[in-house]
A protein has these predicted regions:
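N-terminal leader/targeting and accessory segments in enzymes
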Residues: 1-100, 104, 219, 249, ...
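Nucleotide phosphate-binding/pyrophosphate-handling subdomain across enzymes
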Residues: 2-8, 18, 25, 29, ...
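Conserved hydrophobic helix-helix packing surfaces used for dimerization/oligomerization
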Residues: 8-9, 75, 115, 141, ...
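Beta-strand->loop->alpha-helix junctions that form or flank phosphate-binding loops
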Residues: 36-37, 55-60, 99-103, 144-146, ...
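C-terminal helical cap/extension that packs against the catalytic core
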Residues: 50, 376-434
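Short acidic/histidine-rich motifs immediately flanking catalytic phosphotransfer sites
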Residues: 68-74, 162-163, 432-434
Length: 458
């Protein structure tokens, strides 16, 4: 189906971070947009306020009439929705055009120059940073992001004239195989989603296949430390990057008084005195990748420097809520061992002499089963670890798999505790916290406003 000729778009799973970006895009393109989601959330309420009706029961009668025309309505669904879903079955039985979110993004990468960011971790921050640099430059861009940009208060950017589209490329369910990138960054390939891939080798092969999809004339920008071996086509350039080595890297790094600056080293043009608007150590490396992609597509040194300085970050990605001499509170979406490790290293680098406490809600039983020892090693960099029950998301419980697996593997010197998430506010109220980080991709983040209010009165 030609996206230019559809009149209505119906979303099954409209409240997902990636799905909602597409919903907003089609609304701005003048299409009738509606959808279903399992539960109301702040994001679904925002969509409703913006003019997108959403309901929360599997009810065919609730589907607007404009979305029941098989000739003019496109149905987009998330892989998390089961085939038994009543509304999905309704559309399938009647022969509607039904696509996954990634298929629609793939179509956009055929009509635009797709600047994609893939990787186990770092892709949301890197893609949002790149989109901000590009959008503020003379080039501009469209963007579909995996988080809410704090610069724009939304998860997408729409341009009236740019041929570029920045996309966070999701490896879950091999979704990124639908894309045809003009250029792509690959930040990391630490195995994840083994419930889908089965083995580390299959996971790495999926990324290898992704590199075959880069368009001729484009480029691969790949982290120096990856096990995965790329398989690029003819006329595709390859560049490497990291914090301190590769074709693109940072030098003269300065971390002091809550500020971070560095010199950007590039085969195109070095850019001295880059200041991070969100001063987090991990954003040095993310920033190098974002600047590399933006520079390769025409951004000037001044535009790179200005974009980095004004970048405010992404909600739930090293997201500071309180930052003063008495308390530091931040939330972070980290839910893979390597993400936890990067967050722990960054916060330790920023607050070397302060007590750091993490409250962590593991995400998925399979991920906890596969990586509990790795989680424990990463969390053991901190002084105190409070573990909540596993957030199941799409999964059923697995016998013997609980947060205690991580708890039992924590280093001897780490103070530790197991609590229910509902008890977190009381725990914060009754304990002294110096630097407190809320970790995980589940619903523990819903308690952050309450935790913030408690700490502000202490």
């Amino acid at each position: 189906m030609d996206l230019q000729h559809i009149k209505a778009v119906y979303f099954i799973g409209a409240g997902g971070i990636g799905m909602s970006a597409l919903a907003r895009y089609f609304l701005h393109m003048g299409r009738v947009v509606a959808g279903y989601d399992k539960t109301p959330t702040p994001l679904t309420r925002e969509l409703v306020q913006e003019g997108i009706p959403i309901h929360y029961d599997e009810d065919v009668e609730a589907i607007p009439e404009a979305c029941k025309d098989v000739q003019s309505c496109l149905v987009i669904y998330t892989p998390a929705v089961p085939e038994t879903h009543k509304e999905l079955a309704f559309f399938r039985q009647r022969g509607f055009e039904i696509q996954k979110r990634a298929q629609v993004l793939g179509t956009l990468t055929r009509s635009h120059k797709g600047l994609c960011v893939a990787g186990t971790h770092g892709k949301t921050s890197t893609s949002t940073m790149c989109a901000h640099i590009m959008h503020e430059s003379h080039i501009d861009c469209n963007a579909f992001l995996g988080g809410i940009s704090k610069n724009y208060g939304t998860n997408y950017i729409l341009s009236s004239h740019s041929d570029y589209v920045v996309i966070e490329a999701d490896e879950y369910d091999r979704s990124f195989h639908w894309l045809r990138p003009w250029m792509t960054v690959i930040t990391a390939t630490d195995p994840d989603h083994l419930d889908i891939y089965g083995t580390k080798e299959a996971y790495l092969e999926s990324f290898r296949h992704y590199t075959t999809l880069i368009q001729p004339g484009g480029a691969l920008i790949i982290h120096t430390d990856l096990e995965m071996k790329a398989n690029i086509g003819a006329n595709v350039r390859t560049f490497t990057y990291s914090r301190d080595a590769g074709d693109f890297y940072a030098e003269n790094i300065k971390i002091a008084d809550g500020e971070i600056s560095f010199d950007f080293v590039s085969p195109l043009e070095n850019v001295p005195e880059v200041v991070l608007g969100q001063p987090v150590p991990i954003n040095i490396e993310n920033g190098v990748a974002a600047m590399a992609m933006a520079q390769l597509n025409g951004c000037t040194a001044d535009e790179l420097r200005a974009g980095m300085k004004t970048y405010l970050g992404v909600e739930r990605r090293f997201d500071f809520q309180i930052r003063n001499n008495r308390h530091v509170l931040l939330s972070d979406y980290a839910h893979h061992p390597q993400e936890i490790l990067q967050s722990a290293k960054s916060i330790r680098e920023l607050y070397r002499d302060r007590k750091i406490t993490a409250i962590f809600q593991p995400h998925l039983y399979t991920r906890t089963r596969d990586f509990y020892a790795d989680f424990a090693r990463a969390l053991s960099l901190l002084d105190e670890v409070i573990l909540c029950d596993i957030y199941p998301a799409r999964e059923q419980p697995i016998h013997g798999v609980t947060s205690r697996l991580i708890y039992d593997q924590l280093a001897p010197g780490v103070k530790k505790e197991l609590i229910h998430k509902e008890d977190v506010p009381d725990w914060v109220r009754n304990h002294d916290s110096d630097v407190l980080i809320i970790l995980g991709a589940g619903d523990l983040n819903d308690y952050v406003p309450q935790i913030k209010a408690i700490l502000e009165t202490k």
